[in-house]
């Protein structure tokens, strides 16, 4: 029984590890906290050609330290598991970046709009 408990703990520890979050290809991850849910980035659904993931740092405290999250929301664009670009909230605790700026960064990575 102790072995089963230990196995479940190990699985839980690795279930949300940053290596699992970072997928192959291009991913846009919004890190936020439940106390700041009202300031979630509403335009995230408008960004195209990217896998979009929203995560609560309250659910996995290691996300904050592993990803260097200093304020919420924070949006990080990854390519093949490597951080490419980061947008962080200011004192207002909201992300004031036009979605088109994020889309342009995604387009650079996907090669969209190239002739």
Segments from the language model and where they lie:
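Local sequence-structure signature of Cys/Sec-based thiol-disulfide redox active-site neighborhoods
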Residues: 18-53
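N-terminal post-signal-peptidase region of extra-cytosolic proteins
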Residues: 57-65
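Hydrophobic h-region of N-terminal signal peptides that target proteins for export
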Residues: 6-17
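Structural micro-motif
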Residues: 67-79
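Active-site-proximal beta-strand/loop segments in catalytic clefts of secreted hydrolases
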Residues: 31-33, 57-58, 90
């Amino acid at each position: 029984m102790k072995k089963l408990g230990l196995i479940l703990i190990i699985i839980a520890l690795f279930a949300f590890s940053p290596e699992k979050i970072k997928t192959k290809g291009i991913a846009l991850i919004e890190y936020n906290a439940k106390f700041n849910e009202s300031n979630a980035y509403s335009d995230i659904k408008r960004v195209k050609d990217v896998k979009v993931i929203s995560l609560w740092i309250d659910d996995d405290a290691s996300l904050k330290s592993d990803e260097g999250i200093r304020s919420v929301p924070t949006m990080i664009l990854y390519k093949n598991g490597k951080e490419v670009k980061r947008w962080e909230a200011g004192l207002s605790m909201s992300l004031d970046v036009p979605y088109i700026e994020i889309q342009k960064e995604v387009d650079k990575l996907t090669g969209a709009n190239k002739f």
